[in-house]
Amino acid sequence: RPEETQETFRNTLASRLPENSRAEGAPDDDRWMATGDLGVIIDDEIYITGRLKDLIVIAGRNHYPQDIEYTVNHASEHIRPAAIAAFAIEGDDVEKLVILAERDLGRDPSGDAEAIEAIRAAVTSAHGVVPSDIKIVDVDAIARSSSGKIARRVARRHYLGEAE
């Protein structure tokens, strides 16, 4: 599939980057590979921070799911640490933010409503976006990869299947 090979392995910059960029001195026809990873360079070291496909764009603003999940993690003790999936779904005019969070071990579902309000307030304040839906689910209900990482895209597909 030549078009997929072109898209992945033969990318070029549409225009030169500003002076003092990491690409300074690279030939005009230099190529780069589109891995789909997001990263940052600190002290000449590259750190992978996420996946482009997981980036949440609402009303033209980028939101990193890890940042939203961090906020949720600290918004309520009712939520199981590191068991949160934030993702976007299509809305009528703009994408909508959805948050799935696992209830912590030993917590009663009767505390869900209070936790949801705390999460909504924290995310709205910290990120300037109001979640369209927040669901608190049982422990281990959110899909994970074989290495134990939250599988956001799988969680999104499951959510959309339930919503239909």
For the regions a language model picked out, list residue spans one by one.
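AMP-binding/adenylate-forming catalytic core of the ANL superfamily
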Residues: P2-N11, D29-H127
